């Protein structure tokens, strides 16, 4: 290769690196307004009952691609469940969940240990009034012990939905009106159970942090001790919330690709508020974030069509 060719090749590589760095710098800022263009996913409208609507959304500025499922749990044809893998390694793809559980809509659920086989759930997993995994009661940060009651999503058999800061004791669940007042380098002194009330749900899972509370954006990532982790950063995302009408909102945002960068927690909260939620919670994200409708993957998890196997999921079934 001649000296001129080497210089041209080096200049081209340098230009590409500069473009990538500039693009990342431009896209890493947090947006306070996210104007989405939403439309009904047409090929789902004829097969699903009136209580289930599937939408796709686009914002060119960030940019992001997103999918939302709006579910009316009062529809007698609709059932909401939190489900757990029954495979030997305790993980399945959402398509497998969809087929095994006869679910029409499935999104990924809570955090799990990817480097352990069989895997274990990170935090509460409560299915059919039975504790599969207990709540995370404390975590270590910089050799300091932080007590925590992290955000949880709960379903009741009557179709009601709740999002709360939750802990567990044996097979009993308890929720707090406010999160524990943790701050980076400043943990709460103790875990005060006297401030907790029984939480009456049939299915529940820990994830977090909470994104919205009482109709307002309130991202409690520090209180739930997610500082010192990558969770607050820009990622592909899955979130769940509910409207004042009681409708469940499930949202998946693609990320880690040129056409869809992903969102941070504040941006995710904005999207959920714009979808009409009064309460909302962040679920497991990254390569786990996916939505399957009638066995078909709608999004591109972390830029691919390969589904990550997960331990828990939220399933919408039709009677």
Language-model segments: residues:
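Short, conserved active-site entrance elements at the starts or edges of catalytic domains
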Residues: 184-191, 199-227
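Conserved, well-ordered active-site substructure
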Residues: 116-141, 220-279, 288-319
């Amino acid at each position: 290769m001649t000296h001129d060719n080497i210089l041209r090749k080096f200049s081209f590589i340098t230009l590409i690196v500069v473009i990538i760095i500039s693009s990342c710098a431009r896209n890493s800022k947090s947006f306070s307004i996210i104007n989405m263009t939403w439309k009904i996913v047409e090929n789902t409208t004829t097969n699903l009952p009136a209580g289930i609507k599937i939408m796709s959304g686009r914002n060119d500025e960030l940019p992001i691609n997103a999918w939302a499922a709006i579910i009316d749990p009062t529809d007698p044809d609709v059932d909401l469940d939190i489900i757990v893998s029954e495979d030997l390694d305790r993980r399945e793809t959402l398509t497998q969940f969809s087929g095994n559980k006869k679910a029409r809509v499935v999104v990924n659920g809570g955090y799990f240990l990817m480097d352990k086989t069989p895997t274990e759930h990170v935090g509460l997993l409560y299915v059919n009034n039975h504790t599969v995994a207990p709540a995370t009661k404390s975590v270590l940060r910089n050799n300091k012990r932080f007590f925590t009651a992290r955000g949880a999503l709960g379903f009741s058999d009557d179709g009601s939905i709740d999002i709360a800061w939750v802990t567990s004791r044996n097979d009993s669940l308890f929720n707090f009106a406010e999160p524990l007042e943790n701050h980076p380098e400043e943990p709460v002194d103790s875990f005060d159970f006297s401030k907790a009330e029984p939480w009456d749900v049939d299915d529940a899972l820990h994830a977090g942090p909470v994104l919205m509370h009482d109709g307002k954006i309130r991202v409690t990532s520090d209180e739930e001790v997610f500082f010192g982790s990558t969770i607050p950063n820009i990622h592909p995302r899955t979130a769940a919330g509910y409207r004042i009408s009681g409708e469940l909102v499930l949202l998946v945002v693609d990320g880690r690709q040129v056409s869809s960068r992903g969102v941070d927690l504040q941006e995710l909260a904005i999207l959920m508020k714009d979808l009409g939620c009064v309460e909302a919670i962040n679920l497991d994200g990254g390569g786990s974030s996916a939505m399957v409708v009638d066995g078909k993957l709608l999004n591109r998890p972390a830029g691919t069509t390969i589904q990550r196997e997960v331990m828990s999921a939220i399933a919408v079934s039709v009677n």
